[in-house]
Amino acid sequence: MKEDNKTYVDTSKVSIREINKAIAKDMIVTYHYSHAWTMCRYALGIFYKTDELDILGNDEQLIGVAVYGFPVGRSAVTSIIDGLGNDQCLELTRLFIHDGYGSNIESYALGQTFRWMREHAPNIKMLLSYSDPFQGHLGGIYRATNWLFQDTNKIQLMPNYGISLEGEDGTYIHSRTVFSKWGSHNLEHLKTEIGKDGYKEFWRRKEMSKLRYIQILPTNKGEKKKLMNSLKHPCETPPKDISDILPKSERYETYEPENMVNFW
């Protein structure tokens, strides 16, 4: 449903087609918030039809790009779904569109990339994408384009924990830094070592992994049912607020350092 206070893109002026990867790289490195290129199998340019011709006689302007690459890791796909190989799945690694083309331009353009895949890469049966909640990305664009959501934080076999010395709502030290600073993730060890640093308490919280979104690209209803049944983990309603998925922190008291007696 369209909202009165929003501007929407004229979808008749938007088109998608594959572009040179060098052009896509330049756009991503220049404009994407990461300013970093990534793995790329298909670079799909997002074009907008203009009312005037440019100096080369073109009536379309490149306003964005969607970059899809093969997932990294031997078991990247098989850990998610049975029956598909790594060459049948792509990951949306970058998406950038210039501002000023309507509030729904991202969702419309992303949906058009699904159509492009079905037509030009029919061997691709599943798309993946990840959002980082601690970067403020909960995946609103994926909700708008009907991706399936899996809470990877419930799938972790060996979760990592961050430590706060500033209270429950303070800054949490990353697990890698915790190990580097205190030599272990063992809770009893941390109680001792953090106590030696003069702290009487600390808070520990499970670190969140990136949220996983899945788009199935079946050729028919039967294949869709088969692919859905082959997913190894349940799909859930995607979160709308980080508080919906933020792990609870736990408070611990440290051990007081033993009095050291010097013998002379």
Regions from the language model: what does each represent?
Residues M1-C40:
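Short amphipathic alpha-helix that is part of the acyltransferase structural core
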Residues K13, K210, L217, I242-S243, ...:
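A positional "C-terminalness" feature that preferentially activates on distal terminal regions of long
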Residues I28, R41-Y68:
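Conserved beta-hairpin
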Residues R41-A43, M208-Y213:
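Short hydrophobic/aromatic beta-strand or adjacent loop that forms the aromatic wall/cage
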Residues K226-W264:
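Short, cationic low-complexity segments
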